[in-house]
């Protein structure tokens, strides 16, 4: 079996120490990134829908950078979106709230290579106020 390398970017040590999970694990040339949410280095939920989407992608970027990868290396993205009563009112043509805005933010980060993507609507996330979680898998070049 290939070596297992734990990836803990600067500023994310608190999630490992407090919650006992790794932001990323690299095995061989495959990087598994834990679900990243819209909270800052102090574990405070970022206010504002677009700001929270941006923070999620910035957190994914921190893990990618720490592992020597980029968004071009991401082959799979799974996103979990909190849905609620507002979903039926605001989410046309999608059932996930704010999905159009999420896709606009996503496109700022994925500019060359696009990953597979599964978007899932859920009832809630781990902390009040969180609206999305992004989990990625990346395959790095073996150079």
Predicted regions and their residues:
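N-terminal presequence-like segments and the immediate start of the first folded domain
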Residues: 1-76, 81, 85-143
């Amino acid at each position: 079996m290939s070596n297992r390398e734990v990836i803990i970017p600067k500023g994310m040590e608190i999630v490992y120490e407090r919650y006992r999970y790794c932001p990323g694990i690299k095995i061989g040339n495959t990087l598994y990134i834990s679900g990243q949410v819209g909270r800052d280095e102090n574990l405070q939920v970022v206010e504002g829908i677009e700001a929270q989407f941006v923070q999620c992608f910035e957190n994914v970027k921190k893990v990618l950078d720490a592992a020597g990868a980029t968004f071009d290396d991401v082959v799979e993205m799974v996103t979990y979106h909190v849905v609620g009563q507002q979903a039926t009112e605001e989410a046309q043509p999608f059932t996930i709230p704010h999905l159009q805005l999420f896709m606009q933010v996503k496109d700022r980060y994925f500019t060359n290579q696009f990953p597979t993507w599964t978007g899932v609507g859920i009832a809630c996330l781990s902390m009040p106020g969180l609206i999305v979680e992004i989990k990625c898998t990346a395959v790095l070049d073996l150079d």
